[in-house]
Amino acid sequence: VGIAKLEGYELAFRRGYLTILPKEGASVEGLIWSVTDHDESQLDCYEGYPTFYDKETLTVTDADGTPHEIMVYTMNAPYRDQLLPVSSRYNAVVLQGCLDAGISPQQFYDADEKYRKAYKARAAPVPKKHAPER
């Protein structure tokens, strides 16, 4: 249907995939799709609903400022709290999707950079404490 903006959320990598997380002052650009009940049923299977992702109804605005109520998949706890590796293939598909849709890839780059820093910090070895000298 078109490009829209979701206010009050940020794009974030969790458990190797993208999701949206509430964040004051942030926004996420995406596409509004028109889907049939059959399409939604197929998407539910693909997205792992209701175990991996849940569905929420949120309001977005299109380029003309018109509000639209949409359904989005959001990652469930505890999955959204896990930092797992992201595949380069997944990143390439998401980036190409942004470019094909005419969405700025900056939000993807920002989410990727934030994830890499958090993953690296989590994976960093803990320094050993040295025994005091006698």
Name what the model sees in each region:
Residues 1-134:
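Glycine-aromatic micro-motifs
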